Swiss-Prot record:
Organism of this sequence: Buchnera aphidicola subsp. Baizongia pistaciae (strain Bp)
Similarity remark: Belongs to the UPF0053 family.
Entry annotated with the keyword Protease: no
Subcellular location: Cell membrane
Taxonomic classification: Bacteria, Pseudomonadati, Pseudomonadota, Gammaproteobacteria, Enterobacterales
GO cellular component, one term: plasma membrane
Name assigned to this protein: UPF0053 protein bbp_300
Membrane topology: Multi-pass membrane protein
Length: 519
């Protein structure tokens, strides 16, 4: 009892507890790695049982202190080498650490490892417990030797070991959660295990490496890993502020398109030689076709598009003027490959109904009043500010009819059919009286001025033509905004990495443009 009244005893006890905890941190890390091989419901139990057994083993080693002191005497000796009991323990312990670290690193670095929990094969419970006890026994050697060198009092040493082990038991669960959330820490710790194993083997063979070098290397690596974790955390924080839809779309596009996709917003480069090698090893049936990439990109970017980029523009609408002669209306219906027509009074903004060409031809043959006939099917009108997702619901309610798009003043801007939405996703389907909007020639593209910018971006594999603050949706709108006025034929406009040469233009619009890439 008088022993605990001595202040030096309390100072020694506190010092020894701190040393035991510091020397046991590495043990906790590897206990967490081992327990991860068990089902989640058994991990806590394995840690508690394993560390409890390890506690009794440490107490047993302390009780046999007098015998441990004699471990420095030679047991095996000849003219080539000599080993003491301590050397043999260090040798076999170091070899065990090297073997265990190599196996664990191989599993962590193997790309074929199954991450699916349903297919994951867990290790046996007692197998992991035994490994925890063995691992703790190896790591406890330095702690036991430290205890012997610090205080030459067995009860104080046992109290310090018990307190340190209880604190380690409490800290084992949160430390395990941290390691499971940060897998790079696991690889780092396994690398430490290799270093420690090599050091134990070299020390057993008589090659003494100053512990300061080992601790300096471990400390420096930990600092670098802390920087990596901070950078990772800041990256995830910045990513969380971006719209989830945009992040999901970019992740899928990077997966499908690989090196061809570049996110200019976050300046993340996806050029990766390893990915290219992996992609080259896949067969043609496994890789994504260009059409599949185009459609996936169209689906993911549909919500970000404007109605103006999807609709058929006003100048391309085929409509019926009821004030025209019947024979001219009949010729128009027969010559135009459309099945639905807006019927208007003199101008497109005066829509009275949407009719089918076949039904209107029958009405003309039977001399039915066209105004009364067309008024039975009223047009569905939507504003040009409607988003594409809500547009899908409108098209479903239209039941195959077309939808008229107007601006805030009621002027018709265009029309939309289900085919227009399909073209926004899968690409252009030209009618019989149309030519493709984009025609590829040698090292250049011939593009109509009214071509949608989203389709053009996908075709040219670029991402810098569309800006959210701009209202234009066509190539002509982009070039006029870039020039500040309507460009003339023969003029060239440069928007890196592209060069736009105006081939055909009138006083009112751009008809045809040749696009080349800058060299």
């Amino acid at each position: 009892m008088e022993l605990f009244l001595d202040p030096s005893t309390w100072a020694g006890l506190l010092t020894l507890i701190i040393l035991e905890i510091v020397l046991g941190i590495d043990n906790l890390v590897f206990v967490a790695i081992l327990s991860e091989k068990l089902p989640p419901c058994k991990q806590d139990k394995a840690r508690l049982i394993g560390l409890s057994f390890a506690l009794f083993m440490r107490l047993g080693l302390l009780a046999l202190m007098s015998w441990m002191v004699t471990l420095t005497s030679e047991i095996i000796s000849n003219k080539y080498f000599s080993f003491s009991g301590r050397d043999l323990i260090l040798l076999f312990g170091g070899l065990f650490l090297l073997f265990k670290a190599t196996i664990e690193l191989h599993e962590r670095l193997d790309n074929d490892i199954q991450k699916n929990e349903n297919n994951k094969h867990y290790a046996g419970f007692w197998t992991i417990v035994i490994q925890i006890v063995i691992l703790d026994s190896i790591f406890s050697l330095d702690a036991i030797i430290t205890a012997v060198g610090t205080i030459n009092n067995l009860p104080i040493m046992m109290i310090a070991v018990v307190i340190a082990m209880v604190l380690m038991l409490i800290a084992s669960k949160p430390l395990t959660k941290f390691i499971n959330l940060h897998q790079t820490v696991v690889v780092l710790c396994l690398s430490f295990l290799l270093m420690i194993g090599c050091n134990l083997v070299s020390e057993a063979l008589g090659f003494y490496v100053p512990k300061g070098y080992l601790y300096a290397a471990i400390g420096f690596s930990i600092i670098i890993e802390i920087f990596n974790q901070i950078a990772r955390r800041n990256f995830m924080l910045h990513q969380s502020r971006r719209p989830m839809r945009q992040r999901a779309a970019e992740a899928i596009l990077r997966l499908m398109i690989g090196d061809q996709f570049r996110n200019t917003t976050t300046n993340i480069s996806t050029k990766n030689k390893d990915k290219e090698k992996i992609r080259n090893r896949t067969t043609d049936t496994e890789s994504f076709k260009e059409e599949e990439r185009y459609m996936i990109n169209g689906v993911l970017t549909l919500a970000a598009r404007s109605i103006r980029s999807i609709m058929t523009p006003r100048n391309e609408i085929s409509w019926v003027n009821i004030y025209q002669p019947k024979n001219k209306i009949r010729s128009q219906l027969l010559d135009t490959p459309h099945s639905l027509f807006p019927v208007c009074k003199g101008q497109l903004d005066e829509v009275i109904g949407i009719v089918r060409a076949k039904e209107l031809l029958v009405a003309l043959e039977r001399t039915i009043n066209i105004i009364d006939f067309s008024s039975t099917t009223l047009p569905i009108i939507i504003p040009d500010t409607l988003d594409p997702i809500n547009l899908l619901g409108v098209l479903r309610r239209a039941k195959g009819s077309l939808v008229i798009v107007t601006n805030e003043f009621g002027a018709v801007q265009g029309l939309i059919t289900p085919l227009d939405v399909l073209e926004a996703i899968a690409g252009e389907f030209p009618d019989a009286d149309e030519t493709p909007d984009i025609i590829f020639e040698k090292d250049s593209w011939l593009v109509k001025g009214g071509t949608d910018l989203h389709s053009l971006q996908q075709c040219l594999n670029i991402t810098n033509l569309i800006k959210q603050e701009n209202s234009y949706a066509s190539l002509a709108g982009l070039l006029i905004a870039q020039k500040g006025q309507l460009p003339l034929p023969g003029e060239t406009i440069v928007i890196p990495p592209l060069r736009f040469y105006i081939l055909e233009a009138t006083q009112y619009r751009i008809n045809l443009v040749r696009i080349t890439k800058q060299h």
